[in-house]
From Swiss-Prot:
This is Urease subunit gamma. Its EC number is 3.5.1.5. The lineage of its organism: Bacteria, Pseudomonadati, Pseudomonadota, Gammaproteobacteria, Alteromonadales. Keywords: Cytoplasm, Hydrolase. Heterotrimer of UreA (gamma), UreB (beta) and UreC (alpha) subunits. Three heterotrimers associate to form the active enzyme. Signal peptide: none annotated. The keyword DNA-binding does not apply. One of its GO terms (cellular component) is cytoplasm. The gene is ureA. NCBIfam families: PRK13241.1, urease_gam. CDD domains: Urease_gamma. It is found in: Cytoplasm. Belongs to the urease gamma subunit family. It catalyses: urea + 2 H2O + H(+) = hydrogencarbonate + 2 NH4(+). GO terms for molecular function: nickel cation binding; urease activity.
Amino acid sequence: MELTPREKDKLMLFTAGLVAERRLNRGLKLNYPEAVALISCAIMEGARDGRTVADLMNYGRTVLTADQVMEGVPEMVHNVQVECTFPDGTKLVSIHEPIV
């Protein structure tokens, strides 16, 4: 199977999101890369489900709470940007202050 660099990046991000989700389900607090991966993965899946950019920008702020991440992580994550494919093309989804 041949994958483009973009497809490889998406696959790696999705894998990191799955690892983060499993750790969260086990009751572990997520670190910075895990938190960003989980939020990004949720946004990509939402785009695949047909949600709008505006809806995903709001949804991205509900994926994680400060209690679910390690101390200091909410202050480190100011913005998460994910390039997603929508029915009308590729768009950049930005989530500002995603962990409340």
